[in-house]
């Protein structure tokens, strides 16, 4: 999609719209949505959303984008903005874009091979049973750590406890993103951090928090036992970070990725574990859904909804 020379990237209308979007979305998402809409408006700042009423033209414009994920991002931006505004005059138009977005998702889903992997994934992939086996090995190592070793700041012993806790977080519950646990502290407090109170995880800060709100999850008893033993041995206190407590500044969750890479000896981080988990859980489901949809005479989207 060719772009004309760019003028000023914003104006009063767009600034007001951004403030409205910030009530529902993060700053990054709000800015991204505005940028997508500006590009659809010939990369010119817009003073209304009237250009979106030319939905056939907009869809044709998006269809010229080669990358499927990029095409989806434009549709998502349009629907996201119109959903947030919820203006009756645009509801019919929004339904058109929603249908286009849903049709796109169904088309992509029909083409998905749940076992297909990127080059990086192929080079570093392990099955979920291998992840579980690695967890069992880490548990054996952690069980051998003594309180005396921890009190003497034995780095090997401390690392054994930390690595065991880290991988347990990704195996005893569906794997979450790095930041979700990197920003987790002990106790219960403000909404600027995530918390573990000895029984539950409270997630306030995560990628989709603006849309989903706070999430509270019961910690499985086996994981609770491991966490509480780790906290006791490491002498962690209220407000301390759960993981890598020496890292007070919390500059980057890359610390989590490096630790996971070290555990597996491969480029396996949170994202890869999420893919491995999803493949383990759903790998054989899509062919069944597709066959069922065909036999029932409706689309995959009907079953997915």
Where are these regions (language model features)?
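Short, polar N-cap/turn motifs at the start of nucleic acid-interacting alpha helices
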Residues: 266-267, 285-305
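Helix-turn-helix DNA-binding helix
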Residues: 30, 71, 256, 292, ...
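Non-catalytic DNA-binding core/recognition domains of DNA-processing enzymes
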Residues: 10, 18-102, 219, 272
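Active-site/catalytic core of tyrosine-dependent DNA strand-transfer enzymes
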Residues: 218-277, 282
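Basic, Lys/Arg- and aromatic-enriched nucleic-acid-binding interface segment
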Residues: 132-179
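Conserved tyrosine-mediated DNA breakage-rejoining catalytic core shared by Y-recombinases
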Residues: 182-223
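A short, glycine-centered helix-capping/turn motif at helix boundaries
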Residues: 159-163, 169-189, 284-287, 296-298
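Flexible interdomain linker/hinge and immediately adjacent N-terminus
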Residues: 90-150
């Amino acid at each position: 999609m060719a772009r004309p020379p760019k003028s000023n990237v914003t104006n009063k209308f767009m600034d007001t719209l951004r403030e409205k979007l910030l009530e529902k979305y993060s700053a990054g998402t709000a800015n991204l949505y505005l940028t997508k809409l500006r590009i659809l408006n010939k990369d010119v700042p817009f003073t209304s959303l009237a250009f979106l009423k030319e939905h056939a033209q907009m869809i044709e414009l998006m269809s010229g984008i080669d990358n499927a994920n990029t095409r989806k991002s434009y549709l998502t931006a349009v629907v996201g903005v119109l959903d947030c505004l919820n203006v009756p005059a645009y509801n019919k138009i929004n339904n058109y874009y929603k249908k286009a977005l849903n049709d796109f998702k169904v088309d992509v889903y029909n083409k998905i091979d749940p076992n297909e992997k990127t080059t990086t994934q192929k080079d570093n992939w392990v099955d979920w049973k291998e992840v579980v086996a690695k967890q069992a090995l880490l548990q054996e190592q952690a069980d051998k750590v003594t309180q005396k070793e921890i009190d003497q700041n034995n780095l090997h012993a401390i690392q054994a406890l930390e690595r065991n806790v880290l991988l347990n977080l990704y195996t005893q519950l569906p794997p979450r993103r790095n930041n979700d646990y990197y920003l987790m502290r002990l106790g219960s407090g403000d909404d600027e951090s995530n918390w573990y109170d000895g029984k539950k995880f409270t997630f306030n800060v995560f990628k989709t928090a603006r849309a989903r709100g706070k999430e509270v999850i019961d910690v499985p008893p086996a994981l609770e036992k491991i966490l509480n033993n780790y906290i006791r041995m490491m002498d962690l206190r209220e407000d301390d970070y759960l993981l890598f407590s020496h890292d007070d500044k919390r500059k980057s969750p890359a610390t989590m990725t490096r630790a996971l890479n070290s555990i597996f000896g491969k480029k396996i981080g949170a994202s890869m574990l999420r893919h491995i988990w999803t493949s383990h859980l759903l790998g054989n489901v899509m062919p069944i859904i597709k066959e069922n949809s065909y036999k029932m005479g409706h689309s995959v989207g009907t079953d997915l909804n």
